[in-house]
């Protein structure tokens, strides 16, 4: 009999187990079978669903429904009862209209990569707390957005409409928008009212549209007082836009347009701008003082423009040399005229800008590079930056040293081709230097494609080996002194020299001995010895091989003569059949081999021969011949009985 205390213990244990298992069973039943639920995160993505499954827990906060086949009919009406849901991922589905029946308090909605064509006020008014709306890669057009569709979206901060069918910026956007992405559409015009009132807008992306200067209003961006980033990449602008908001703009992207001029007031009052990119345009010069108001500029990128380093660009060199170290300027490489092509504007001396009215004394430093004697000058190449002095002794005299500025440093360069793809550069310095910038460029190639190569060498070095060059190609080598602050001296002139790499054939210095050897085929003294040794080894090997073959052939012939037997029709005299004939040997077969066993040469006595008459038992024939009743020697041989020992009964 069970005691009352023990009964109470068992009852309490069962009740405890029930309350522990009950929540698990309820939770298991509340999660749809095709989904996975994890603390408010419902994972129903990538399951080829055509509708949103029912039975989603009421405490769900994030719904992952992307990469399915859900259409508008597949969104159940009870979905709007999930009041705790804040994020819904419905991208890459089969929606063709803006979905309804969404939870009221959703804040982040991802609908990209569908086929949504219309946006109505009815659909947006049901989710008034929406903050982020992603509609990239759909079929939304300007006329398919209902007028006033966003008038109740007072919390909307991010609106992404990239890669749609928009031809203009949608009107009536809420003032709360901070980021607006309209890239890769068909927008060709932007009127001032389009962006009017978007005082909270911080980032505006208009890349990949059809915008030109005529399609932009005079002050279309001027009222965007909080705009920090403006991107107009991959459009059809021919001039930099003006009247930009100068209060907060920090990043301006204008690359990949057709800009060939910059108005003098384009960047006025942009004192907060720290990044400006105008790469891949058609700029050849810049108006003087265009960057004067850019007090906080740290990144200026101007790559792949056809810069003409004439007198109009001399101010750029002076401005570059006055910049602090923190300012990073890229892409100011001369494309013309030919004499300075491939050189950095920062490296050019005042004489190279050809400013005739500037009053600059055209004094040329006589300490130039020693020409490469192995490479003749060619008329079609541009003249070097500095001229070769018409003196035999390259060593400077006292008078020649005083022709330039006393602070000017002298460099003497010598270039020698070592191999078809290597040149040796050596130099001498008249005064000690901290560092030098060494650069080389293949002539006839645009430096915009990376043909120019630069390196920094310390002042203690006096030579440098350049490898991986193209054989039989012209190159220009330049050297410029540098200070420790990484700024060039104002009066420093780059010293350049032109050379050519050797052809692909073996490079030989032009000495008298080599000229004599060129008349004869090239001979290497080490090759005959190796050839003699190799030939001797080959001859010995061939002789040994021939000897072995002869020996095998000779022994094989004798062996064949002693052991050969006829492969044709056998005759009764070919074998010593059943030991009844006198022979010197008997063919003994052992499994798969045979052996010749000699027998005594003494004649076998006739008394040992016994002829047995074979009588078939019970009148049975010893063989069966289907073709003929007559006997034949072949039939008997097939039966295993010798021909001569067989007799009929």
Curated annotation (Swiss-Prot):
UniProt-annotated stretches for the region Disordered: 378-405, 629-649
- In which broad location class does this protein mainly occur, judging by the first location in its UniProt entry? membrane
Q: Which residues lie on this side of the membrane: Cytoplasmic?
A: 550-649
Task: List the GO terms this entry assigns under cellular component, sorted alphabetically.
Answer: axon terminus; axonal growth cone; cell-cell junction; cytoplasmic vesicle; cytosol; dendrite; endoplasmic reticulum membrane; extracellular space
Domain LRRCT as annotated: residue spans: 305-357
* Induction of synthesis: Up-regulated in neurons in dorsal root ganglia in response to peripheral nerve injury (at protein level). Up-regulated in neurons in dorsal root ganglia in response to peripheral nerve injury.
The record's annotation in SUPFAM superfamilies points to:
L domain-like
Annotated Fibronectin type-III domain residues: 405-504
One GO biological process term is: fibroblast growth factor receptor signaling pathway
List residue spans for each LRR repeat. Answer: 59-80, 84-104, 105-126, 129-150, 155-176, 177-197, 200-220, 226-247, 248-269, 272-293
Give a brief account of the tissues where this protein occurs.
Detected in brain (at protein level). Detected in brain neurons, especially in basal ganglia, hippocampus dentate gyrus and CA3 region, cerebellum and in olfactory bulb.
Name the cystine pairs: 31-37, 35-44, 309-334
What subcellular locations does the record give? Cell membrane; Presynaptic cell membrane; Synapse, Synaptosome; Postsynaptic density
Transmembrane segment boundaries:
529-549
Coiled-coil ranges per UniProt: none
Q: Name one Pfam family in it.
A: LRR_8
Sorted keywords for this record are: Cell adhesion, Cell junction, Cell membrane, Cell projection, Cytoplasmic vesicle, Developmental protein, Disulfide bond, Endoplasmic reticulum, Glycoprotein, Leucine-rich repeat, Membrane, Repeat, Secreted, Signal, Synapse, Synaptosome, Transmembrane, Transmembrane helix
Extent of Basic and acidic residues compositional bias: 389-401
Q: Which residues lie on this side of the membrane: Extracellular?
A: 29-528
Q: Which residues are glycosylated?
A: 226, 282, 296
**PTMs per UniProt:** N-glycosylated. Proteolytic cleavage in the juxtamembrane region gives rise to a soluble ectodomain. Cleavage is probably effected by a metalloprotease.
Give the signal peptide range.
1-28
UniProt subunit comment: Monomer and homodimer. Self-associates (via leucine-rich repeats), giving rise to homooligomers. Interacts with FGFR1. Interacts (via extracellular domain) with ADGRL1/LPHN1 and ADGRL3 (via olfactomedin-like domain). Interacts (via extracellular domain) with LPHN2 (via olfactomedin-like domain). Interacts (via extracellular domain) with UNC5B (via Ig domain). May also interact (via extracellular domain) with UNC5A and UNC5C. Interacts (via extracellular domain) with UNC5D (via extracellular domain).
What is the name listed in the Swiss-Prot or TrEMBL entry for this protein? Leucine-rich repeat transmembrane protein FLRT3
Q: Which organism is it from?
A: Rattus norvegicus (Rat)
């Amino acid at each position: 009999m069970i005691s009352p205390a023990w009964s109470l213990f068992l009852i309490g244990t069962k009740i405890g187990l029930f309350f522990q298992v009950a929540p698990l069973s309820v939770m298991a039943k509340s999660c749809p079978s095709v989904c996975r639920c994890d603390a408010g995160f419902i994972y129903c993505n990538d399951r080829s669903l055509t509708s949103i499954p029912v039975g989603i827990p009421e405490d769900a906060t994030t719904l992952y429904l992307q990469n399915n086949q859900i259409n508008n009919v597949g969104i159940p009406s009870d979905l709007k009862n999930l009041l705790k849901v804040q994020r819904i991922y419905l991208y890459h589905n089969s929606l063709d209209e803006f979905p309804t029946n969404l939870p009221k308090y959703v804040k982040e909605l991802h609908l990209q990569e569908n086929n949504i064509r219309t946006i109505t006020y009815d659909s947006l008014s049901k989710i008034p707390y929406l903050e982020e709306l992603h509609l990239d890669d759909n079929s939304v057009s300007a006329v398919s957005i209902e007028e006033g569709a966003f008038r109740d979206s007072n919390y909307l901060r991010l609106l992404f409409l990239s890669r749609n069918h928009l031809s203009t910026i949608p009107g009536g956007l809420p003032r709360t928008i901070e980021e607006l992405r309209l890239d890769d559409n068909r927008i060709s015009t932007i009127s001032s009212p389009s962006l009017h009132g978007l005082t909270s807008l911080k980032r505006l992306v208009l890349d990949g549209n059809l915008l030109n200067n005529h399609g932009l209003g005079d002050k279309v961006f001027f009222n965007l007082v909080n705009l920090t980033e403006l991107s107009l990449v991959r459009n059809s602008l021919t001039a930099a836009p003006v009247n930009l908001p100068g209060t907060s703009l920090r990043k301006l992207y204008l690359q990949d347009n057709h800009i060939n001029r910059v108005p003098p007031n384009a960047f006025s009052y942009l004192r907060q701008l720290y990044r400006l990119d105008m790469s891949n345009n058609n700029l050849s010069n810049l108006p003087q003082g265009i960057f004067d108001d850019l007090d906080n500029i740290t990144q200026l990128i101007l790559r792949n423009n056809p810069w003409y380093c004439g007198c109009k660009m001399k101010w750029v060199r002076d401005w570059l040399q006055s910049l602090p170290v923190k300012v990073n300027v890229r892409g100011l490489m001369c494309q013309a005229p030919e004499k300075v092509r491939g050189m950095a504007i920062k490296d050019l001396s005042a004489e190279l800008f050809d400013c005739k009215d500037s009053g600059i004394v055209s004094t040329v430093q006589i300490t130039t590079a020693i020409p490469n004697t192995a490479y003749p000058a060619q008329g079609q190449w541009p003249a070097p930056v500095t001229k070769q002095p018409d003196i035999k002794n390259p060593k400077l005299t006292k008078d020649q040293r005083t022709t330039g500025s006393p602070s000017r440093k002298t460099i003497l360069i010598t270039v020698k081709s070592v191999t078809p793809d290597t040149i040796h550069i050596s130099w001498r310095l008249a005064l000690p230097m901290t560092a030098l910038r060494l650069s080389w460029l293949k002539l006839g190639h645009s430096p915009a494609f990376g043909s120019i190569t630069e390196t920094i060498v310390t002042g203690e070095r006096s030579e440098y080996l350049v490898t991986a060059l193209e054989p039989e190609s012209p190159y220009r080598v330049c050297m410029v002194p540098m200070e420790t602050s990484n700024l060039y001296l104002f009066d420093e002139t780059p010293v350049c020299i032109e050379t050519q790499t050797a052809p692909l054939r073996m490079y030989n210095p032009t000495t008298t001995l080599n000229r004599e050897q060129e008349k004869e085929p090239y001979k290497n003294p080490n090759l005959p010895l190796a050839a003699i040794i190799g030939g001797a080894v080959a001859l010995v090997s061939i002789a040994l091989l021939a000897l072995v073959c002869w020996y095998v052939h000779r022994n094989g012939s004798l062996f064949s003569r002693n052991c050969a037997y006829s492969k044709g029709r056998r005759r009764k005299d070919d074998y010593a059949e059943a030991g009844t004939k006198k022979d010197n040997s008997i063919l003994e077969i052992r499994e798969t081999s045979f052996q010749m066993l000699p027998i005594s040469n003494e004649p076998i006595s006739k008394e040992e021969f016994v002829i047995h008459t074979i009588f078939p038992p019970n009148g049975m024939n010893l063989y069966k011949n289907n073709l003929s009743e007559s006997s034949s020697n072949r039939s008997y041989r097939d039966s295993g009985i010798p021909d001569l020992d067989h007799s009929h009964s």
